[in-house]
Amino acid sequence: MTKNIHDQRILILDFGSQYTQLVARRVREIGVYCELWSWDVEEADIREFNPDGIILSGGPESVTEDNSPRAPQYVFDSGVPVLGVCYGMQTMAEQLGGKVAGSTEREFGYAQVKVSGESALFKDLELTQDVWMSHGDKVVEIPADFVKVGETDTCPYAAMANEEKKYYGVQFHPEVTHTKGGLQMLENFVLGVCGCERLWTSESIIEDAVARIKEQVGDDEVILGLSGGVDSSVVAMLVHRAIGDKLTCVFVDNGLLRLNEGQQVMDMFGDQFGLNIIKVDAEDRFLKALEGKSDPEEKRKTIGHVFVDVFDEESKKLKNAKWLAQGTIYPDVIESAASKTGKAHVIKSHHNVGGLPDDMEMGLVEPLRELFKDEVRKIGLELGLPYNMLYRHPFPGPGLGVRVLGEIKKEYCDLLRRADAIFIEELHAADLYNKVSQAFTVFLPVRSVGVMGDGRKYDWVVSLRAVETIDFMTAHWAHLPYDFLGKVSNRIINEVDGISRVVYDISGKPPATIEWE
């Protein structure tokens, strides 16, 4: 009998660490399904989920404080292996009879762990491990039946284990790339200790998603709002593989897209992949609604409302469509559930994840709702979507609506499109595009004096923006070569009539945000 990709699973309890989603992504990368739930989950929910192993994440709280988070007692009564990471190790130690104390020496950054004894967690690893620490408190006394399996110069219990019960704790973060052997440690736990198999692969995810879509919609028709972005594009390919021409995609051209993007979407999905796709040219409608609006939040809301109205009108023309496909991904689900209930594991379908009307009388098809963004990209490649589309830099939902500062006009959008295309083209030509995390151009609603030939010109200013980041929570401005910036500036000023000055944004995040609006 073929095993289902969800048959073996790891449960990750979230205590609030900034790295918790990274733990889940690493487990998926190993090839095992996992879910991320809030630490205060009910015992009945854990029983129903029936995990093969449980990971307790790090977190910002202190075990020494009253009312700080604790793992549900059932975690330790369930008989399944448990791995505590950072705060997770501390609460494990304290709950099982050990002691945790505050430390005058906060350990943050690289450290060397000396591995002692033999532990399944460190199988096939060197006895000295470079790891990433981020903690103030530390375990000062381990519970009975545990042994020390790792220490640093300042942390006597950097790792502990109860091999019989398959309980493990590490004070460092194996999920971050700074911990060189971290992925191997997680593999040792997930595959070795928990006994899971690598069932979670791009091929098996696609096979499972297609089967579930077929079962869910049967012979009904499905409608999808296709933006040309990663998520909706992968949904389009999955649903089309499942039901073929019973899928209709609606592509709304709002006039706020990148240069030639509308035609590229139609060429790729209509001509190349043979999907049913309706293009709605709504540029005038969007620009009319945006007249006189300069506040960024007001612009975002206006763009969202007009999109909903346009999509709603088109969906009503498709009388036989009973299902709405959406590109909801797992981080959306986690964030949405946590904000509504405080418990991130409560996974319910609701239109507002995608920002569509509450009164749409359609069922939801969300084939990506279990997937992280990196997984979506991988299955997109498997489905035949081009690499350069799947791995393009992020583009905001409101498009150029938040890259034209202040009021939006067609003239401004047209100038910005052409300037941005030159910047991106030159980044590719110089082999710099994939060396920065995000790059784009911003239109500034100010005029500046310039000289062209023998005459003076009084035209608009654009700013180039390029950043390097791992998680987009913080970012450094990219130190692009001066010669490169000079070339881009010259091309924009010479080739885009209406722009007289180009500047480069050297602000980090914080204090600035990556986007200007």
Swiss-Prot record:
InterPro entries: Class_I_gatase-like, GATASE, GMP_synth_C, GMP_synth_GATase, GMP_synthase, GMPS_ATP_PPase_dom, NAD/GMP_synthase, Rossmann-like_a/b/a_fold. Residues 9-199 form the Glutamine amidotransferase type-1 domain. One of its GO terms (cellular component) is cytosol. Pathway: Purine metabolism; GMP biosynthesis; GMP from XMP (L-Gln route): step 1/1. It catalyses: XMP + L-glutamine + ATP + H2O = GMP + L-glutamate + AMP + diphosphate + 2 H(+). GO terms for molecular function: ATP binding; GMP synthase activity. PROSITE patterns: GATASE_TYPE_1, GMPS_ATP_PPASE. Residues 200-392 form the GMPS ATP-PPase domain. Catalyzes the synthesis of GMP from XMP. Homodimer. This is GMP synthase [glutamine-hydrolyzing]. It comes from Vibrio campbellii (strain ATCC BAA-1116). The gene is guaA.
